[in-house]
């Protein structure tokens, strides 16, 4: 399945015990496996309708995946693993999220996800700003949302990779994100070289998802992503939410934006408070049996 080109192998793991990190490595391999941006597991939950687990191609387990949860929703709804009207409550590593499937001709074609509130405090992301340095390096008047204490923010913070400096602003959507707004087209940046170096900077104790963004209007953004544990992907749902949260925080966008990534367009809404709402497409590509 894929959501805006972010592709996953989804499996019902309610009655299975496997070495899932190793399974993820084998299945995700695009040359010797099925090929994907990771695997997603359906698991039972004591606190929600169902539980979602997600493993990256390197075997690491991620807290959440915005495009993945749409794939997950299509899987559990169409296979009647969860049978209910309206929104589903899904347990994830980032908390319990509410997902509303949007059905067309009897199939889940899109999904709307309440992704939770963005967090900007350095310790919540986490970002380990070196002693003696300030994480917040902007004029406070640049902030459109003043409820966030500037002494807890990492905003406009310069990082240098391969002799090039990016000014990043960081946020958590249950997983860590660093966002850099660029004047030059994002398509021309050698993200395959820069991305892994940013991911593994000592600044990020749990590594980071790195996004480069062009602002094309108050309601229109374009971005590319290097995902922690996965590399360059065609889209990143939590990343799209973090991008809009950061842009809205800095007064660069309106409440709702169309965010274009190489795999498609996501609609992201955040008015400066409450949960970020993400809506986007989901498609099943094929079904098969993995024999290891």
Indicate residue ranges for each PLM-predicted region.
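Short clusters of hydrophobic/aromatic residues that line enzyme substrate/ligand-binding pockets
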Residues: 125-127, 159, 198, 290
């Amino acid at each position: 399945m894929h959501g805006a080109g972010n592709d996953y192998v989804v499996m019902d793991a309610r009655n299975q015990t496997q070495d899932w990190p190793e399974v993820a490595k084998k299945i995700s391999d695009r040359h010797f496996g099925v090929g994907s941006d990771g695997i997603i597991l359906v698991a039972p939950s004591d606190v929600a309708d169902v539980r979602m687990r997600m493993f990256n191609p390197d075997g690491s387990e991620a807290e959440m995946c915005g495009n993945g949860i749409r794939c997950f929703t299509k899987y559990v709804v169409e296979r009647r693993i969860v049978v209910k009207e309206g929104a589903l409550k899904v347990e994830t590593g980032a908390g319990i999220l509410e997902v509303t499937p949007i059905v067309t001709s009897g199939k889940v074609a899109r999904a709307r996800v309440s992704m939770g509130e963005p967090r900007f405090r350095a310790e919540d992301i986490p970002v380990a700003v070196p002693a003696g340095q300030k994480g917040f390096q902007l004029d406070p008047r640049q902030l459109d949302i003043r409820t966030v204490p500037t002494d807890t923010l990492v905003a406009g913070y310069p990082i240098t990779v391969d002799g090039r400096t990016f000014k990043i602003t960081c946020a958590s959507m249950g997983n860590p994100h660093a966002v850099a707004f660029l004047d030059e087209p994002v398509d021309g940046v050698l993200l395959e070289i820069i991305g892994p170096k940013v991911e593994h900077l000592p600044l990020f104790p749990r590594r980071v998802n790195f996004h480069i963004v062009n602002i094309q209007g108050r309601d229109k953004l374009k971005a590319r992503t290097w995902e922690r544990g996965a590399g360059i992907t065609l889209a990143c749902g939590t990343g799209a939410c973090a991008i809009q949260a950061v842009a809205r925080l800095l007064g660069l966008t309106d409440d709702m934006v169309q965010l274009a990534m190489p795999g498609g367009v996501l609609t992201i809404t955040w008015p400066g408070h409450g949960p970020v709402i993400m809506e986007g497409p989901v498609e099943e590509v094929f079904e098969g049996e993995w024999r290891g």
